[in-house]
Amino acid sequence: MSRVLLIDDDQHLLMALPAVFARSPCVITVDTASSAEQALRLIQATQYDTIVSDFSMPGLNGIEFLKECKAARPDIPIILLTGYGTLELEEKAFEEGAYALIQKPIDADDFLSVVTRAIIRRELRQAGLSDPMSPISIDAHTIRMESKRLSSRLRDIDERLRRQIKDADKDRSN
């Protein structure tokens, strides 16, 4: 049985995401925390296989929380959730040891896939076995997530341009 700590100040997300784990091929117990401080106390008292944390919470930000977690438990994969990911944020998160960065809104299948891979990878490392999760598969996931983020950004830009064209056409006709 695997144990995951889910941290977010959004109570709706804390209630919704544990249901996603019921679809996992692994048996996963989920603990929740609504603040980074509460999570750090739980991490000291409980052995987790993976930690999933919102990036933007009151108190510690995602990078500060990541540093504290890695100092306490360097072997635990940490997945950050963010609603406003930038390339700069991603680079900093990976530099500090994040396993993955997932964009909100969360796709349940992608989320479950990333968490399950993190759990399996940790278990294999603990058993001293090689990791079949090649960098290529991880890179493919990263590319897919970045593609979704960029597609969303392009849709937003397209919508803004359409509104500006529509406004300009109205101005010309007046």
Residue ranges and their predicted role:
Residues Q11-D31:
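Two-component/phosphorelay signaling modules centered on CheY-like receiver
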Residues S130-N174:
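C-terminal output/effector regions of signal-responsive regulators
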Residues T32-T50:
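Acidic, metal-coordinating helix/loop segments flanking the phosphotransfer/catalytic sites
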Residues M57:
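Receiver (REC) domain active-site loop signature in two-component systems and cognate sites
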Residues S34-S35, N61-E64:
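Acidic catalytic/metal-coordinating carboxylates
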Residues E88, I106-V115:
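C-terminal output helix
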